[in-house]
A protein has these predicted regions:
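Beta-strand-rich interaction surfaces with strong enrichment in secreted/lumenal proteins
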Residues: 438-442
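Surface-exposed loops/turns
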Residues: 419, 444-445, 458-459
Length: 481
């Protein structure tokens, strides 16, 4: 589906106005007298499967630092109570999470054994029960800042480790969903520091990126694997400038690898982006995404076909706040920066996730005196299933009858727009209650098809309504299960 990146650059969803309207209020997820902290941006702090969200963090409420977890079963509307995942006399911190179906995997750094090691645990029932802690590393040095990703039964964890004197990047893989683990693999080898690795997997294609100062200043490097992390390419230098490139975050779908990082080449720290179309072998040019007087740090990236979402922390307004921007054409163009937080405290290390049409962000925030975990969502910030079927400008507005009708549970809705402008396509029940929003933002002129999946609704009569400028049309559809 990422062919949209090539075929439809004219699909310029200028979503900034729509996303401003749709981002909901901040939600405080933790409430205790200690500090609640997320991992750095090399790791994912929030993950999802469908409408079920899962997040992890470090918390000192029990005297020493432990790993905590909580979930939402309704796309972030409500959240369950905090669950303590670790319980030992050492400190546990920098947790990273991956979710696939009902399987939740968490990895973190832990010094219960005297030195810092990488640990792992998982749940196979959606977070209700958890396995015992599994120690993955065993050496006399420091192993920390883990990142995790999985595809099917293949799981890969990357981390930094100074068992060899200086920090190097290591990886470890499991071929059976985290039940058994293979030997550690050292991925970097130089006399300088290789740190803060971030990992992404799509099928058997694995990419790991990190920051490295072998060249005198910090640059971004990567390695890729085409066999699920069994063997690896050589090291590839991805940035090349006289300043510092740090804080890399990476994601992938098929052969498409998207990467963002912080870069000081322009005097202050800015957010940059680049992508690969061939699984991380070659990358396009660097793109500067921010241009502000304050420093921009710790970007987090999530993608869905041609839609690329990036959030980061930035101090252009005096204190650190969370900012966001979107590309709807595979990184060819970008929206303006959108400030998501606005309080007197510092908002830092945000982590972004996509679930269906919704966007979710968690971050650390000290507006309450101590640092707590906050959450924010945009229910329609990732417009899934919207496909441009023609860029020829139609003669007038048109809303077609859905097909098939009756349907179960998927149907298609076509609509035509003679002019660019704000468009809303929503579904309502018999009582007039809005039950789904398929489009809510700016669209270019053309003809589009929206895929609607009504798996969460019961059988009955529903209505879908298109609103565009002065045009409004409503049609009836029937769901039969």
């Amino acid at each position: 589906m990422k062919q949209i990146k090539f075929l439809f650059f004219t699909l310029l969803f200028c979503f900034q106005a729509g996303t401003i309207a749709q981002w909901e209020n901040d939600t405080r997820l933790t409430n205790n007298s200690s500090q609640s902290l997320l991992a750095y941006n090399n790791a994912k702090s929030i993950s999802s499967d469908g409408n079920t969200l899962h997040t992890v963090w470090t918390d000192g409420r029990d005297g020493n630092l432990e790993i905590y977890y909580k979930r939402s079963a309704n796309a972030g509307v409500n959240w369950n109570a905090d669950v303590r995942l670790t319980n030992n006399t050492g400190s546990s911190y920098y947790p990273a999470i991956h979710v696939g179906g009902n399987t939740i995997m968490v990895t973190w750094t832990d010094n219960r054994d005297g030195n810092y090691e990488i640990y792992f645990k998982k749940s196979e029932d959606g977070g209700s029960t958890w396995s015992t802690d599994t120690r993955l590393t065993n050496n006399a040095s420091l192993s920390d800042y883990p990142s995790i990703d999985a595809s099917g039964s293949t799981v890969v964890i990357s981390w930094q480790d100074n068992r060899d004197g200086n920090y190097e990047v290591y990886s470890k893989r499991s071929g059976d969903g985290g039940n058994n683990w293979e030997a550690d693999q050292r991925l970097s080898s130089n006399s300088a520091f290789s740190e803060y690795p971030t990992v992404t997997i799509s099928g058997l294609k694995v990419n790991i990126a990190w920051e490295d100062n072998r060249d005198g200043n910090r640059e971004i490097y990567n390695k890729y694997s085409t066999d699920g992390g069994v063997t690896w390419s050589g090291e590839n230098r991805l940035t090349n400038n006289s300043s510092q490139s740090t804080s890399v975050s990476i994601t992938s779908e098929g052969d498409f690898v998207d990467m963002t990082w912080s870069d000081q080449r322009d005097g202050n720290w800015e957010i940059y982006y680049k992508y690969s179309f061939d699984g991380g072998i070659n990358f396009g040019p660097d793109q500067r995404l921010t241009n502000a007087s304050g420093n921009s740090w710790y970007p987090s990236i999530a993608t869905d076909d041609a839609f690329i979402h990036i959030c980061w922390q930035e101090a252009r307004d005096g204190n650190n706040e969370v900012y966001y921007k979107i590309s709807t054409d595979g990184g060819a163009s970008w929206s303006g920066d959108l400030r998501l937080t606005n309080d007197a405290g510092a908002s830092s290390t945000p982590s972004i996730n996509i679930s269906g049409s919704a966007l979710h962000i968690v971050w650390s925030d000290n507006r309450d005196g101590n640092t707590e975990i906050y959450y924010k969502r945009n229910p329609s910030g990732n417009p899934i299933g919207i496909v441009p079927i023609s860029t020829t400008i139609p003669d007038g507005y048109k809303l077609s009858q859905n097909y098939p009708n009756p349907f179960n549970p998927v149907t298609n809705i076509e609509f035509a727009l003679p002019n660019a402008g704000y468009v809303k396509l929503a579904v309502y029940d018999m009582n007039g209650k809005e039950v789904a929003v398929l489009v809510n933002g700016q669209l270019a002129a053309g003809t589009y098809k929206a895929d609607y999946i009504a798996s969460s609704l019961s059988s009955g009569v529903y209505f879908y309504k298109l609103t565009a400028k002065d045009f409004t049309a409503t049609k009836k559809m029937i769901l039969i299960k």
